[in-house]
């Protein structure tokens, strides 16, 4: 784990990560350290998951516009619907998520390279996916205990990145005496 202003893109790429999570933060994508450049460099080949600010950075990096949300959503729950694919594979068609943001990726001018994969009832984009790169973003916080199916969504990202955890046997291993 690294702060987005405490490591360079070159240093990240040297680490040869199998997946990258761009985490939340209190600023705009322009103020988010190396995030925009990292999306540009790593996005075509390394699976990326952007959460909140990371989602906004993905939208901006590919030509979308980050705008003020109609209302600040700090600690609010919203029901979303989604495509049922990629990050949302095998999840209920609609579920509640936790939101902590005042900025969003705007619907108008969403670049052709990005697909909105989840939204609220009033049409706010809650999920994005790049059409050809292994890049995904969610505006909400799947890591929040109040977000339904957050662990399953994160497990889906790990699977997409080829990092799905191995299943363990329920029985403990026997040791020779």
Describe these PLM feature segments.
Residues 77-79, 125-127, 137:
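Conserved hydrophobic/aromatic beta-strand scaffold that supports enzyme active sites
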Residues 86-132:
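Catalytic beta-strand/loop cores that center a nucleophilic Ser/Cys/Thr
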Residues 144-177:
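Acyltransferase
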Residues 1-7:
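A short beta-strand-loop structural module common to alpha/beta enzyme folds
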Residues 14-90, 94, 154-156:
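Cysteine-nucleophile active-site neighborhood
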Residues 52, 101, 141:
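Histidine-centered divalent metal-coordination motifs
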Residues 7-16, 109:
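Short amphipathic alpha-helix with an adjacent loop that forms part of the alpha/beta core around
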Residues 132, 137-148:
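Phosphate-binding/catalytic loops
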């Amino acid at each position: 784990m690294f702060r987005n202003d405490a490591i360079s893109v070159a240093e990240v790429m040297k680490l040869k990560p199998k997946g990258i999570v761009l985490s939340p933060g209190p600023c705009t994508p322009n103020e988010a350290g190396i995030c925009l450049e990292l999306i540009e460099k790593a996005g075509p080949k390394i699976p990326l998951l952007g959460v909140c600010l990371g989602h906004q950075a993905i939208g901006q990096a590919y030509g979308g516009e980050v705008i003020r949300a109609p209302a600040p959503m700090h600690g609010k729950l919203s029901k979303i619907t989604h495509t049922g694919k990629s990050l949302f594979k095998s999840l209920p068609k609609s579920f509640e998520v936790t939101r902590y943001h005042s900025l969003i990726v705007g619907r108008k001018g969403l670049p052709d390279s990005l697909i909105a994969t989840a939204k609220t009832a009033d049409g706010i984009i809650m999920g994005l996916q790049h059409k050809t790169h292994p890049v995904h973003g969610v505006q909400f916080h799947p890591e929040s205990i109040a977000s339904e199916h957050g662990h399953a969504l994160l497990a889906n990202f790990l699977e997409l990145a080829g990092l799905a955890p191995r299943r363990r046997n329920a029985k403990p291993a026997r040791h020779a005496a």
